[in-house]
Amino acid sequence: MQKKAELYRGKAKTVYSTENPDLLVLEFRNDTSALDGERIEQFDRKGMINNKFNHFIMTKLQEAGIPTQMEALLSDNEALVKNLDMVPVECVIRNRAAGSLVKRLGVEEGMILNPPLFDLFLKDDAKHDPMVNESYCETFGWVSQTHLARMRELTYRANEVLSKLFADAGLILVDFKLEFGLFKGEVVLGDEFSPDGARLWDKDTLNKMDKDRYRQSLGGLIEAYEEVANRLGVKLD
């Protein structure tokens, strides 16, 4: 499947059309951003790692009965995916307190959240992805109540699958975000799942193994991503 016109260029991925209107090419670049895109750097191998990591995770989720946009790996940094009508709201699950939750509520980082928290954020970098709720989604017409309920259900199901997957690899799934879209009327998981959009800590040391290494200038970003991938059994080379 050959990519054609560039449709969208995000902070770390580019989307291309194909000869099939139902399919797109998702290209993972080496770009890494923080502060809603204000800080951007390039890291060798990052696009390849995230592409293969995402394919691995999406395959695991599909095997668990969660519909995803993934069709096939095309190359080291490209994947063939379904063309979704994306919902402008992202779902976040928090198993432990970290990031904006700690800043907002003043709770201790690492606090276990039982049951896990479910948050919604409007996808808008210019407005710094403001937190919203179900009422906002209905009033502004971002997503129907039925589709939002399905998104919530699939997000919690993904959390069950992935928490065990990472725990078996000696990692804590602290939190993560998921984006969904509609494909022929069905809610389908889109975008990506990688250490760019999840917080992953080593179970024993609590070392951060995700993009917080870049956000907090800890160093060793690619080494951490590669270690997570290797622990899970993702074939990188």
UniProtKB/Swiss-Prot annotation:
The lineage of its organism: Bacteria, Pseudomonadati, Pseudomonadota, Gammaproteobacteria, Enterobacterales. It holds the Pfam family SAICAR_synt. Coiled coil: none annotated. The keyword Lipoprotein does not apply. InterPro entries: SAICAR_synt/ADE2_N (IPR028923), SAICAR_synt_PurC (IPR033934), SAICAR_synth (IPR001636), SAICAR_synthetase (IPR050089), SAICAR_synthetase_CS (IPR018236). Pathway: Purine metabolism; IMP biosynthesis via de novo pathway; 5-amino-1-(5-phospho-D-ribosyl)imidazole-4-carboxamide from 5-amino-1-(5-phospho-D-ribosyl)imidazole-4-carboxylate: step 1/2. It is an enzyme of class 6 (ligase). GO terms for molecular function: ATP binding; phosphoribosylaminoimidazolesuccinocarboxamide synthase activity. The keyword Ligase applies. PANTHER family: MULTIFUNCTIONAL PROTEIN ADE2, SI:DKEY-6E2.2. CDD domains: SAICAR_synt_PurC (cd01415). Belongs to the SAICAR synthetase family. It catalyses: 5-amino-1-(5-phospho-D-ribosyl)imidazole-4-carboxylate + L-aspartate + ATP = (2S)-2-[5-amino-1-(5-phospho-beta-D-ribosyl)imidazole-4-carboxamido]succinate + ADP + phosphate + 2 H(+). Keywords: ATP-binding, Ligase, Nucleotide-binding, Purine biosynthesis. GO terms for cellular component: cytosol. PROSITE patterns: SAICAR_SYNTHETASE_1, SAICAR_SYNTHETASE_2. This is Phosphoribosylaminoimidazole-succinocarboxamide synthase. One of its GO terms (biological process) is cobalamin biosynthetic process. HAMAP family: SAICAR_synth. It comes from the Bacteria. It comes from Erwinia tasmaniensis (strain DSM 17950 / CFBP 7177 / CIP 109463 / NCPPB 4357 / Et1/99). Its EC number is 6.3.2.6.
